[in-house]
Structures are given as C-alpha cells and as structure tokens.
C-alpha cells in the first residue's frame, strides 16, 4: 500500500510544483492530506516523516526543486507534525 501512496504522493507534489497556479490545487491538497492521514493511521508520525523525506529527496534529485513547503499540508494530522 505504501508504494502506491508514495507514487501518488510524488505525482501530486510534482504536479503542484510544476503547476503552481493550477485551478485544481485545492483538490490536490485534500488528497495529500488524506494520504497523510492514511500513513499516520498505519505508522504514526514516523511513517509520515519517512514518506515525506523520500519524496523530498526524489523531487530534489529529479526536478532540482524543494518540496519542503508542502509539509504544512499535513499539519493538524498529528500533534508531532508541525511545519
């Protein structure tokens, strides 16, 4: 399950980075939040951190961009996650 979520998460963040003015960003943000909730339910804040770190690294390596600003999309899922 995590592999599917990771690929979907990567695709969504890549889309958001490459299309910052797209009209569907709010729906993308909502899906990212759902992915974060699923990860948290499965493995807590550690699972969230591991997934985001992996995605950040891939985006930096493949696109040369920084995805850190999107960490805030998972705020309010866990008391441990505050960005």
Q: Where do the PLM segments sit?
A:
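Amphipathic alpha-helical repeat scaffolds
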Residues: 10-17, 36-37
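Amphipathic alpha-helical binding modules
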Residues: 50-83
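Amphipathic alpha-helical coiled-coil segments
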Residues: 34-50
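Compositionally biased, low-complexity repeat tracts
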Residues: 32, 39-40, 60, 70
């Amino acid at each position: 399950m995590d592999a599917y979520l990771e690929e979907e998460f990567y695709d969504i963040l890549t889309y958001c980075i490459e299309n910052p003015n797209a009209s569907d960003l709010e729906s993308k943000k909502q899906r990212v939040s759902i992915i974060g909730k699923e990860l948290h339910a499965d493995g807590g804040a550690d699972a969230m951190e591991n997934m985001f770190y992996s995605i950040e690294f891939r985006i930096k390596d493949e696109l040369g961009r920084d995805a850190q600003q999107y960490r805030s999309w998972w705020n309010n899922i866990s008391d441990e996650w505050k960005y």
